[in-house]
Amino acid sequence: NESHQLALTAFGAPQEHYQRSGSGAALTMSEWNNVRKYMKDGMHFSRYNPTYGYDDYGNQNSANYNVYHKPQISLNHIWQIDHKSSLSTTAYVSLGRGYGRTAEPGLNSSYSYTDLTYGANYGTLSHTFRREDGTFDYGAVEFANSPNNPIYDPNSDQFEKMYAGSQLVICENRNDHNWYGLTSTYTNKFADVLDFYAGIDVRYYQGKHNATISDLLGGEYFIDATRAKVKGVNNAAALDPMWQYEKLTIGDIAYRNYDGFVVQEGAYAQLEYNQNNWSAFVNGSINYNHYWKVDYFYYDAEKGKSEVLGFLGGTIKAGANYEFNKHHNAFINVGYISRAPNLDYGAFMNAS
């Protein structure tokens, strides 16, 4: 049909790589100069990663590693209504799967969270687990976590040896989302000098966020210190000491487990004017955002769903441009923007 075009598109680019944590791994200028001694000939010191290293068997490891794949499938339809107007509509789905590694200290751990997560602390390189060549010593972490290196019970008069599991582990902070959406744009050329655009944008997003233990780093189990922060009034499981001190292993979830939901509806319109040396536009948009969460860690099934928060936003913008010649022009733009806050650290106090 000459008036209709239909296209199905699918693409994705899986990626995985080591990474350096942002502000947490930041070093002072003098400290960056100090790490030059660790770099091989020809390698710039800015490529130094404080958490990249090896275990005692030469296996590479890093508490900062990222794996993600976010393929998108879209169905596009273009309808040429007449010689002046058209309607373009796209329905799409995006299924993101992946994680970024982070470190987590265990119950009564004497090791700093920043030592393993960032390899640095307040701009200074951490040497708690540092080899002479500057790489991170995961072998030393594994020894510290092993049953062969027990700590002493501070509550015992005899200071009996006790084993409290891994004092540091690596978790995969997972972000698995399903995102569905539809956009549609109507275009009409009212006259030789006027173009009109209007459209809608509807989206639904569900993101599953948890921290899955992926490496016990030489230990036999892990006791999640975060469980002590869970209130029994919110989650009845917290009333059971066996739950608070449960011995977790690879594949178990620690310190966070929730789903985030976002529903967005929006509409917009724009009118453009072009004649001789003048061009101008005026546009407006309106949107409404619905946010809610379902928490499975800090709350039980009856209390896990939050209230649904709604935010109305929109924009009004206008502008004009005058072209004096091909080298010079003058323009002015004015506008007002109102936007909804982000889901995490905005609509809700924190990400967990």
Predicted regions and their residues:
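Extracellular loop and loop/strand-boundary signature of outer-membrane beta-barrel proteins
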Residues: 1, 58-63, 72-76, 167-172, ...
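Transmembrane beta-barrel strand/turn architecture of Gram-negative outer membrane proteins
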Residues: 1-20, 67-106, 174-211, 311-326, ...
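Bulky hydrophobic/aromatic packing residues
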Residues: 32, 42-54, 62-68, 72-73, ...
